[in-house]
Amino acid sequence: MYQEISQLLMYGDLDEDSILAQMGEVFGKYETGEYNKTGLVRDINTQVKRILKVATDYGFDDNLWHNYLTFFLMMSENPFSMTCEKVGASDGSVNELVENDFRIFKDLFDYDFGPIEKDLGINCFSQISNYKAIHKKDLMYNKNVSEKVRSLSKKLEAAKDEKEFFDAVTGFYKDYGVGMFGLNKAFRIDDTPQGSFTFRAINNMDTVMLDDLVGYEIQKKKLVDNTEAFVQGKKANNVLLFGDSGTGKSTSIKAIVNQYYKDGLRMIEIYKHQFKYLSEIIAEIKNRNYRFIIYMDCLLYTSDAAD
């Protein structure tokens, strides 16, 4: 496994502390025979526990090793995956390089953990390769991501070669995108101690759809027409929703995002004190192949407001 991972090119820029990189180090020791058995088992257990943590957060099931590798491919923002974002793969020499990477990933999918389990007297890889997750309520994990990971994982398991693997992964990039913006519908801004910001996905946003909103037909039509123009790259307007609390303003936005997520619509929610980041936020997202709603709620200005 160490040799396979070390030969990755487009997908080879690994964080040294990532699960995949650490698994490569573990198997490098095993494959050379330069290891202490107790220490190696401890290292393996550490990485398996990390896989279980990711599996719990995102509701993985069945083969957690396959689910993790699939999640890694979905989240990997590299020059190739970014060019495939919402458009799919184009013809070019880079495809051959990527197919080489996908041949390695197929080998990782099909990796036989039997020898290392036998030599070390462990069975953790067998356990996570045939895993039955505890049923969890939707709010306890990211269901939206879980469904996508498990679906693509099954397609990659069935891939006969690197070309089918390539088609499945790039098909996902075309349908949804790549990285956190591809997998998630909506985001908040978190302030950092360094005076900057990070994007944080909003997990399990209400699944309300426009048809669930009774009444407001004229308002809904205006929202739909404006949103459809926006996602199609046509001229669209900024929108101000106003009304008493509980009249459906926030719910309408959630419904719009749910309805047009597959068309590349995403939402970023920012608060009044975060307006100072607005130009930086736009700079971060302007080259991504999505359409972003910048959602500003509770803009409460009073006559004595200093700002």
PLM ranges: what are they?
Residues 208-227:
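N-terminal pre-Walker A segment at the start of P-loop NTPase domains
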Residues 229-236:
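Phosphate-binding P-loop
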Residues 301-307:
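Conserved small/polar residues in nucleotide/adenosyl-binding loops
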Residues 139-198:
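Interdomain "pre-motor" coupling segment immediately N-terminal to P-loop NTPase/helicase cores
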Residues 259-289:
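AAA+/P-loop NTPase substrate/partner-engagement loops
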Residues 297-298:
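Walker B catalytic acidic pair
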Residues 1-154:
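Intrinsically disordered, low-complexity N-terminal extensions of AAA+/P-loop NTPases
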Residues 239-265:
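Walker A/P-loop
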